[in-house]
Every structure is written in structure tokens, then in C-alpha cells.
Amino acid sequence: MSTKNEQLFAQACKHIPGGVNSPVRAFAGVGGTPIFMHRANGSKIYDTEDNAYIDYVGSWGPMILGHAHPKVIDAVKKAADDGLSFGTPTPFETTVADKICEIVPSVEMIRMTSSGTEATMSAIRLARGYTQRDKIVKFEGCYHGHSDSLLVKAGSGMLDIGEPTSKGVPADFAKHTITIPYNDSQAIKDCFEKWGEEIACVILEPIAGNMNMVIPSQEFHDTLREQCTANNSVLIFDEVMTGFRVGLGGAQAHFGIDPDLTCFGKIIGAGLPVGAFGGKKEVMSCIAPLGGVYQAGTLSGNPLAMRAGIAMFEDLTAEGFYDELAVKVDRLVDGFQAAADKHGINLRTNKLGGMFGMFFVTDGDTAVPQNFDEVTECDMEVFNTFFHGMLDRGIYLAPSAYEAGFMSIKHSDEDIDTSIKAADEIFAEMAKA
């Protein structure tokens, strides 16, 4: 780690809590000093000394076209020339809304927000208003942003600091949140048998990306849909991470499930601050000004993010885009797995579309983790060694064993081969240790 980077971190710590503006950036889970970046292009990000790193974080998912995509940058520049924010409706919001509703059949109406957290928070308020019920169901290890009712046994950065439930969340608030095991169909049935008439909604990541990457069973999703329908509870898919990432139609298209509401994140604005929630017209009509559930935001649907999103969707909807992306992920993940197998390293992997997960399990008999408890049983020290080894070789992975990885369309065969070679070297060193 360079002295300059340590100086930057020390300077940041003076006025920024922990030196970062989002906890996972602090390297708390992996140790060491976070690297300060100052620019990015294509598949690479560059630190303040202009060292290049092949990036598999992609701003936590949205940089599916690669960093600084010319079409997106041009759209943002033109938008900025026309004014940054108006506080009025714009035609660009309608264009993005129309495009999302066209792509995702379950979304009949949609409301823009400024973040994924706002989207999930608003979707839950809407579900409560629509059903006139208070209780919500979430799953262990699923992260839905930092609103109070959702920071109960959450994944992502909460796990890195060893606090699965945030301090500062009143007990009276948390009592309305029921948390059950992920990928457990019987737990869903038991939950509805006990509280069915009180449950406003169930919210989940349809593929969990904040306890690494856990792909649940089809039975799990079928059971969720059946139970929510039978009990008149709203099914909310948090596709902030998976939407337009695991496929054009998101995880709901992969599983063939139509949720009642869906939440999206900054990918719809090509990485700029934006989110959205949408779904059935009957439910969405309860939002003000049509209904009595209030939600608002000065920068919701801001023109910079909307025009960036319009440019991005032109590429995402091109024929073969997601096939090409999946080929890149297959090449990378299969290469990692082959290298680990060669050196006797207990690696398990998951992948779908442009998203992947890596788990260092504790023995050769352990399968790919299927839930929160199994993920937490993985060997975090081995991951930390792997993370820093890759970082030293110019490969940037998420600085946490609880986060998924992301591929962009700009990652080249050379990038992928370089990454596999680096992993092979690290696994060889591990095998000798």
C-alpha cells in the first residue's frame, strides 16, 4: 500500500466517519487501507497514482457497459448543458418509465426515486398502505438498503462490522419485521400459517447478492408467490442488484415469477444516483397524488440520470448483449474454478448473466452455500488472502466475502485471462502454505 494512499485515508478520516461514506468501502472485512480511485474507463479503474485495476465491482453492479461509456458520457454532458435539475416533470422520465414497463411485464406503473434504499422503503410503505397491514417479512442475509425496518439481520456491510442488526433501530419499529431463513420453502409456509392475515408484504432479493451470490430454488419462489397470493400479501422483488444485470428481464424472468412490486437501482441511470419501484397498477395507484400513500423526492427522475439511462438501454436491448455478457462470466468463473481445483482449494461458485459469486468453503464435501448460515460458515481468512493477492496483481474484487462480483461488456479476453492467471498464482501459494 502506497504512502500516498495511507495519507489520503488519514485525511479522509479527519472529517468523514471511518474515512468512507459507505461502510463496505472501509476494508473492514478484509483488513488494510481502502484504495482511493480517481478515474475509470472500460473494464478498469485507476487509483490516485494511476495504477490500473481490472474491476469486478463496477460501482456495485450498474457499470454493465463498462466505465465512462462514450454514449452515456455524451448523454450526461448534453443533459448538463440543458440544466442539472428542474423540480418539474420531464419527458425523459416518461421515456425511461415506458422502457422499463415494456421490458418487465410485471411493472405496469413505475415511480422514480433517488436511490435503491428509497425504492425499497417506499415500496414497503406502499404495500402497508395498500393492504392496511403492518407486518413485513424479510429474509436473513438479504440487504434492502438502510431504512430502519429493513436493517434486521441484513447482509452486505452489516456483516463486515459484525452487527447483523443495526443499532439505533427502535424495538417498536423492528417488531413489525419478521425475519426468516432464505431459500427455505417450509419457513415461508410456517410464517404465513402464523401471521398470514397480518402480513402486508414479503420483500426479498430474488437472487441474493449481499451474502455473496445465493441462487434459491424454483420451489422457494413458487411457494412465495402462492403464499402471498393466498393471503393477499404484496410480493416485492428487490432487483436493485439483479435487475437488468442477470438478464434483460431480471431475476423474475429467470424464475418465471411476477411479483406485485419490483425495486430497481442505479443501473437504470447507468450508474448515476437513481432508483425506482413499480408494479401492478392496482397497487401503484395508491401512491400520491392518485392515492393516500405519500412518497416524494426533489431529485426523483432527475434529467441527468434519466438521459444516461435512455442511452444505456439502447445497448442493453441490443440482440445478443446478455449472451455475450454471460459468455464472459462463464469464462472467468470456470477459469477460477479450474485453477482452484488444480491446487486443491475448496472453492464453490455461482453465476448467472453478468453476476457471479465465489465461496471458499471449509472442506471438500461442502456444497455451494444455499442460505445465510451456510455463507457465514465459509472461510473468511482464505477469502481475505485471495482478495489481497488479487489486489496486489491489479484485480479489484469487492472488499467483502459477502458481496457478489460483476462483469461488464467491456471486459476483454485478455482481462479475463489475466484475472485467471492471477488467481492461479494465488491458489498455488495457498497450496504451499
From Swiss-Prot:
Signal peptide: none annotated. Its cofactor is pyridoxal 5'-phosphate. GO terms for biological process: protoporphyrinogen IX biosynthetic process. Pathway: Porphyrin-containing compound metabolism; protoporphyrin-IX biosynthesis; 5-aminolevulinate from L-glutamyl-tRNA(Glu): step 2/2. Pfam families: Aminotran_3. It catalyses: (S)-4-amino-5-oxopentanoate = 5-aminolevulinate. GO terms for molecular function: glutamate-1-semialdehyde 2,1-aminomutase activity; pyridoxal phosphate binding; transaminase activity. The modification N6-(pyridoxal phosphate)lysine is found at residue 266. Its EC number is 5.4.3.8. Gene3D superfamilies: Aspartate Aminotransferase, domain 1, Type I PLP-dependent aspartate aminotransferase-like (Major domain). Keywords: Cytoplasm, Isomerase, Porphyrin biosynthesis, Pyridoxal phosphate. It is found in: Cytoplasm. GO terms for cellular component: cytoplasm. Homodimer. PANTHER family: GLUTAMATE-1-SEMIALDEHYDE 2,1-AMINOMUTASE, GLUTAMATE-1-SEMIALDEHYDE 2,1-AMINOMUTASE 1, CHLOROPLASTIC-RELATED. Belongs to the class-III pyridoxal-phosphate-dependent aminotransferase family. HemL subfamily. This is Glutamate-1-semialdehyde 2,1-aminomutase. The lineage of its organism: Bacteria, Pseudomonadati, Pseudomonadota, Gammaproteobacteria, Moraxellales.
